[in-house]
């Protein structure tokens, strides 16, 4: 840090606006009280004693100024936020965007705890959605403010005066007026550690990661003097480290430290300054290594460091702002990734030499001035005509088009007639206005100045996570169709972070049959289901593909802690399973929906022949199919479990009687309960018994119902009236309910506020299930079961008649002994209130699948796979899909138990893929090309080699080719080395394994804590469909990255290692071994401290040769 220069020789007066003539009779102090750099824009902010907040660009030109606090209260503290700027005064909190427009303003009238405030900081774990405010008022403690809701979230009991506050991702550090520092855990509202930092008071404090630094004052001879040292604390061990001396108090005379701040990018570097002008940059790892500077001024009032660590702002006692800058930062940038600033539109007077034609589209009509007028214009319509300006009539219900399928409007008839004209050779494609715009429409006028100032920041996080709306007919943003931009490799370039502020992972919709994501999320939060499915991973269940892949998916979602996951492997198993059953039945279908229709209709009593009914009931059919298949595969596991059978199984007795006195009784074990329409007379009687309209009568009726239909009697062979009575004989711990009601029935449901009850009680009385809202109504029965709502899947229908599925789940928090509700809309996850979750009055919301769990089962903990004894045998043996072929050449050596991997073991990996389907693009009416369906790939080969030093260093222990019976569009032989027929079990001479076998090997290595070395591992792991923790990845593509240009493995091997690889087709063993050597080279360059120099030369040479390896002359 020895290249700092006093860059700005003419300091700017930040209090110039306080020297206006109208302030001359005001005797209050006219000072700047706070300064702070913006983390998202090249701005520095200041607050004054009159409550005004001002911002300046790097040239110190005024950008914006606004009054944030009324009443003449001074600005106490300023915080930078991703959406704007936060500031506090003694009794108010103000939140505005960078243009000065108020987003939130809270005063002591709104929150009584706002009194004598001094400081604020962000709350741990909140991702800057909550802040803590504290001050001298000890009656209220510390107030937690929710910025999303704009209200008081909670109050922390704290009985001391607060002067300073800062936080990391775990604790809240509080500096008292007396000089003591307290570490507070916001979760438990408990002080976990206190440090007696300074004897009199604390002056400055900063916290970053696990390092806390403080400076303060001590009392000597009835006066306060700054301490000539900096206190340093390690929050991992909760101990104080040796204090670091300040040069002002040692080598440069008497004095002490008044300011301290940790470097934002270098975690071990801090800046320490004195109010007299001297300041040091000190390395905590080596305190003797420091650089000393002196700022020429009378005294320093405030000091702050820019987010990129290149600019030091100093506020002098006369309210002038001066800066020091590093010599490398001549542009004066405050942040490395600044957002574009918005500027006002300026009116340009357009002069014309002659008259302008009315048809001239290049001339804006808004530039024609309006004459002054005294009379009322004809265009000013009276308020009698329109109730409000610029509004459209509100919707009074759902789409007017009938959805029952029985009545067709004229539009539907015309549409069906047009569809008959469509052929396979000449398909009929409807014109889509949303994609191609209005027909024969003149393009809108676009000003070039607006294009220059346009900000492509996308959706606001606070907007997209809003799950309520004032108008109940309007679909809130959280339920809307989410934006998704696909690139060449799917959704790699899409930023999912603004859509999830929780620790629970969403699912990527970029998969086939993505509507199944909602049902997967529903069952992931059932404790008994999760524990069993994940527990099956401890054994090698290679024959139960769907159960195993669901277990891997649940485990990945649990480990990812909010990172988005993909269900691509689960979808592949689902497709292979349906293909297998279709071949067995001799009825091939093209899509999963068609297969579910053919599978589920046979077991259903009702007739779902209309195409609309198939669409309406597809989630219910998939739910029934999923549970049935999981229960079937459960019996095929190593331990032959019956957990799911006991958990979901409904013992149903079906009695069939014919008018010819013939009857038959069968007993079936059904995994789910279908709830269909109920007779109005029956529902009224059941509602009277349950004391109100709710879901209980529907469940009761579904557990014991009678249906009649005319059919041929199997005994007499005549057409008779057959009566079928279905009775449920037990109450399992989990009730999976499938709702198949008509729109008219849902309309009646929406009129009831508490239709979806949160809990109920049930018992079996006289071989019949009886359900009541309270336990007192079931007195006299021996066994009473309490059920609570675990979650449900709802269908959202927007104004465009587009539908999507969302999931509501209830998660138990054992630490706080309470539940919280979450809503999943693919990759959007938001925590909601219970009232909102149970609300069924919205016309756009329709429940599809509902889960009720036993109250005790719902409170069981979720066990990860780490709690089980895992079988690792597959790492030490082969498991081929097509048997061992003598002609196959073995290029690897299996691991032995003596070299069993452990945590930190280095392995190098490379994967190859084939293309199943090419990408699909479209060009809209503006000529913009976008990828609407990325290419589909499949894993073809994985090679893993040893990375630890020893005799077998660099020798592969896994080299598996993956079976693929699907249609392969492109083998990508040039890049993958896979030839046609290599993956076909009937033709291949390779050692083929199934996908779940090779996946288990990679999963076990991750489970053991192995460190993976490779080139472009993010892309490999995405296609393998596994989320590996960052601390277990050593990606050479990122290590040798400068800017945004990724270097190929072949080029890096040629430049750094002198190796010429990939001369023919790619070989995964060669690529993995090269990446391992390249990683060793990286460590060597880092150890010699010449890595940056070598990397610069690599890029300089690469630009000269276009980053390509020179072709070797042959012959």
Curated annotation (Swiss-Prot):
Matching InterPro entries: Exonuclease_RNaseT/DNA_pol3, PAN2, PAN2-PAN3_catalytic_subunit, PAN2_N, PAN2_UCH_dom, Papain-like_cys_pep_sf, Quinoprotein_ADH-like_sf, RNaseH-like_sf
Control of this protein's activity: Positively regulated by the regulatory subunit PAN3. Negatively regulated by PAB1-binding protein PBP1. Inhibited under stress conditions. Inhibition of deadenylation under stress increases mRNA stability, which may be a mechanism to retain the majority of the cytoplasmic pool of mRNAs for later reuse and recovery from stress.
Note on cofactor: Binds 2 metal cations per subunit in the catalytic exonuclease domain.
Annotated positions binding Zn(2+): 660, 662, 713, 716
Region (Linker): 337-473
Keywords: Cytoplasm, Exonuclease, Hydrolase, Metal-binding, mRNA processing, Nuclease, Repeat, WD repeat
Requisite cofactors: a divalent metal cation
One Pfam family linked to the record: UCH_1
The protein's Enzyme Commission number: 3.1.13.4
GO MF annotation, one: nucleic acid binding
One Gene Ontology biological process: mRNA processing
Domain Exonuclease as annotated: residue spans: 907-1079
Domain (USP) ranges: 474-855
WD repeats: 27-66, 112-153, 155-194, 197-236, 295-334
GO CC, alphabetical: cytoplasm; P-body; PAN complex
Localization, UniProt: Cytoplasm
Result, substituting residue 912 to A: Abolishes nuclease activity
Family stated for the protein in its record: Belongs to the peptidase C19 family. PAN2 subfamily.
UniProt function note: Catalytic subunit of the poly(A)-nuclease (PAN) deadenylation complex, one of two cytoplasmic mRNA deadenylases involved in mRNA turnover. PAN specifically shortens poly(A) tails of RNA and the activity is stimulated by poly(A)-binding protein PAB1. PAN deadenylation is followed by rapid degradation of the shortened mRNA tails by the CCR4-NOT complex. Deadenylated mRNAs are then degraded by two alternative mechanisms, namely exosome-mediated 3'-5' exonucleolytic degradation, or deadenylation-dependent mRNA decaping by DCP1-DCP2 and subsequent 5'-3' exonucleolytic degradation by XRN1.
Note on domains (UniProt): Contains a pseudo-UCH domain. This ubiquitin C-terminal hydrolase (UCH)-like or ubiquitin specific protease (USP)-like domain is predicted to be catalytically inactive because it lacks the active site catalytic triad characteristic of thiol proteases, with residues at the equivalent structural positions that are incompatible with catalysis, and it cannot bind ubiquitin. It functions as a structural scaffold for intra- and intermolecular interactions in the complex. The linker, or PAN3 interaction domain (PID), between the WD40 repeats and the pseudo-UCH domain mediates interaction with PAN3.
Note: Present with 1510 molecules/cell in log phase SD medium.
HAMAP family to which the protein is assigned, alphabetical: PAN2 (MF_03182)
The protein, known as: PAN2-PAN3 deadenylation complex catalytic subunit PAN2
Species whose genome carries this gene: Saccharomyces cerevisiae (strain ATCC 204508 / S288c)
Underlying gene: PAN2
């Amino acid at each position: 840090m020895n290249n700092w220069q006093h860059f700005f020789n003419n300091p700017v007066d930040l209090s110039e606006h306080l020297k206006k003539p109208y302030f001359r009779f005001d005797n209050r102090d006219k000072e700047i009280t706070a300064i702070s750099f913006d983390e998202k824009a090249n701005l520095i902010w200041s607050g004054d004693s009159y409550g005004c907040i001002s911002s300046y660009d790097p040239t110190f030109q005024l950008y914006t100024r606004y009054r944030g606090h009324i009443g003449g209260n001074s600005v106490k503290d300023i915080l930078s936020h991703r959406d704007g700027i936060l500031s506090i005064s003694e009794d108010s909190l103000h939140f505005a965007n960078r243009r000065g427009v108020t987003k939130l303003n809270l005063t002591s009238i709104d929150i009584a705890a706002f009194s004598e405030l001094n400081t604020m900081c962000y709350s741990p774990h909140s991702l800057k959605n909550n802040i803590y405010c504290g001050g001298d008022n000890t009656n209220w403690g510390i107030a937690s403010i929710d910025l999303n809701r704009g209200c008081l979230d909670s109050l922390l009991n704290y009985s001391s005066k607060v002067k300073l506050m800062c936080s990391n991702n775990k604790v809240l550090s509080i500096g008292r007026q007396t000089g003591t520092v307290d570490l507070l855990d916001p979760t438990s509202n408990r002080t976990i550690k206190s440090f007696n930092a300074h004897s009199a008071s604390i002056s400055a404090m900063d916290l970053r990661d696990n390092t806390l630094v403080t400076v303060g004052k001590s009392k000597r001879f009835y006066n306060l003097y700054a301490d000539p040292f900096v206190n340093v604390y390690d929050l991992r061990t909760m101990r104080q480290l040796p204090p670091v001396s300040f040069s002002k108090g040692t080598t440069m005379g008497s004095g002490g430290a008044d300011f301290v701040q940790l470097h934002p990018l270098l975690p071990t570097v801090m800046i320490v300054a004195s109010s007299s002008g001297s300041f040091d940059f000190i390395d905590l790892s080596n305190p003797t290594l420091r650089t000393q500077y002196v700022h020429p001024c009378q005294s320093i009032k405030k000091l702050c460091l820019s987010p990129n660590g290149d600019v030091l702002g100093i506020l002098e006692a006369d309210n002038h702002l001066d800066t020091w800058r590093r010599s490398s930062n001549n542009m004066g940038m405050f942040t490395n990734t600044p957002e574009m600033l918005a500027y006002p539109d300026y009116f340009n007077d357009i002069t014309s030499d002659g008259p302008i034609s009315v048809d001239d589209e290049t001339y804006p009509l808004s530039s024609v001035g309006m004459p002054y007028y005294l009379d009322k214009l004809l265009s000013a319509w009276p308020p009698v005509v329109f109730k409000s300006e610029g509004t459209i009539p509100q919707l009074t219900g759902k789409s007017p088009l009938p959805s029952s399928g029985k009545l067709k409007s004229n539009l539907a008839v015309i549409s069906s007639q047009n569809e008959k004209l469509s052929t396979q050779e000449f398909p009929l494609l409807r014109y889509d206005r949303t994609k191609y715009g209005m027909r024969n429409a003149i393009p809108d006028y676009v000003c070039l100045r607006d294009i220059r100032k346009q900000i492509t920041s996308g959706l606001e996080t606070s907007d997209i996570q809003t799950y309520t709306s004032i108008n109940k007919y309007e679909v809130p943003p959280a339920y809307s169709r989410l934006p998704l931009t696909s690139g060449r490799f799917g959704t790699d370039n899409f930023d999912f972070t603004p859509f999830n502020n929780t620790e629970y992972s969403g699912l990527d919709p970029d998969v086939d049959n993505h509507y199944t994501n909602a049902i997967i999320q529903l069952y992931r939060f059932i404790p008994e289901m999760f524990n069993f499915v994940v527990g099956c991973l401890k054994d090698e269940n290679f024959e139960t593909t769907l159960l195993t892949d669901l277990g891997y998916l649940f485990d990945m979602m649990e480990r990812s802690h909010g990172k988005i996951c993909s269900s691509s492997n689960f979808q592949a198993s689902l497709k292979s399973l349906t293909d297998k059953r279709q071949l067995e039945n001799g009825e091939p279908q093209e899509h999963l929906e068609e297969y579910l229709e053919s599978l589920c209709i046979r077991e259903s009593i009702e007739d779902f022949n209309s195409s609309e009914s198939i669409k309406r009931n597809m989630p219910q059919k998939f739910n029934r199919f999923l549970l049935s298949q999981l229960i079937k595969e459960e019996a095929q596991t190593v331990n032959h479990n019956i957990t799911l059978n006991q958990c979901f199984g409904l013992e149903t007795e079906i009695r069939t009687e014919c008018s010819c006195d013939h009857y038959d009784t069968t007993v079936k074990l059904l995994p789910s309960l279908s709830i269909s329409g109920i007779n109005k007379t029956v529902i009224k009687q059941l509602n009277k018994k349950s004391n109100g309209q709710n879901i209980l009568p529907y469940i009761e009726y579904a557990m014991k119902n009678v249906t009649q239909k005319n059919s041929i009697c199997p005994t007499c062979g005549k057409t008779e009236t057959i009566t079928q009575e279905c009775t449920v004989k037990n109450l399992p711990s989990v009730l999976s309910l499938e709702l198949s009601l008509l729109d008219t029935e849902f309309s009646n449901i929406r009129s009831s506020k508490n239709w979806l009850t949160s809990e109920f009680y049930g018992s079996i009385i006289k071989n019949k299930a009886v359900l009541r809202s309270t336990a007192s109504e079931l007195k006299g029965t021996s066994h009473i079961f309490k059920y609570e709502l675990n979650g449900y899947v709802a269908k959202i229908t927007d104004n465009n008649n587009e539908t999507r599925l969302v999931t509501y789940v209830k998660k138990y928090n054992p630490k706080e002994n309470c539940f919280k509700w979450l809503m999943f809309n693919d990759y959007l996850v938001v925590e909601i209130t219970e009232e909102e979750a149970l609300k069924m009055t919205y016309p756009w919301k329709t429940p599809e699948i509902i889960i009720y769990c036993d109250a005790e089962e719902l409170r069981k903990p979720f066990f990860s796979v780490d709690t089980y004894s895992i079988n690792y045998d597959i790492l030490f043996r082969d498991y081929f899909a097509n048997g061992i072929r003598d002609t196959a050449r073995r290029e690897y050596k299996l691991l032995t138990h003596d070299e069993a991997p452990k945590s930190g073991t280095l392995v190098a990996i490379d994967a190859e893929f084939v293309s199943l389907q090419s990408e699909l693009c479209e060009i809209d009416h503006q000529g913009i090309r976008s990828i609407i369906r990325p290419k589909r790939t499949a894993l073809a080969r994985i090679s893993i080699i040893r990375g630890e030093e020893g005799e077998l260093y660099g020798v592969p222990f896994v080299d598996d080719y993956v079976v693929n019976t699907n249609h392969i569009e492109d083998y990508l032989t040039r890049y993958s080395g896979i030839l046609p027929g290599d993956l076909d079990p009937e033709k291949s001479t390779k050692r083929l394994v199934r996908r779940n076998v090779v996946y288990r090997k990679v999963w076990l290595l991750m489970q053991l804590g192995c460190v993976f070395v490779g080139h472009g591992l993010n892309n490999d792991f995405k296609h393998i469909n596994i989320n590996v923790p960052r601390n277990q990845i050593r990606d050479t593509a990122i290590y040798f990255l400068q800017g945004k240009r990724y270097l190929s493995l072949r080029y890096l091997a040629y430049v750094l290692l002198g190796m010429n690889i990939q001369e023919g087709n790619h070989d995964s063993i060669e690529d993995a071994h090269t990446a391992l050597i390249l990683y060793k080279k990286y460590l060597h360059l880092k150890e010699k401290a010449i890595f940056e120099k070598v990397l610069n030369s690599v890029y300089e040479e690469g630009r000269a040769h276009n980053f390509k390896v020179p072709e070797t002359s042959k012959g």
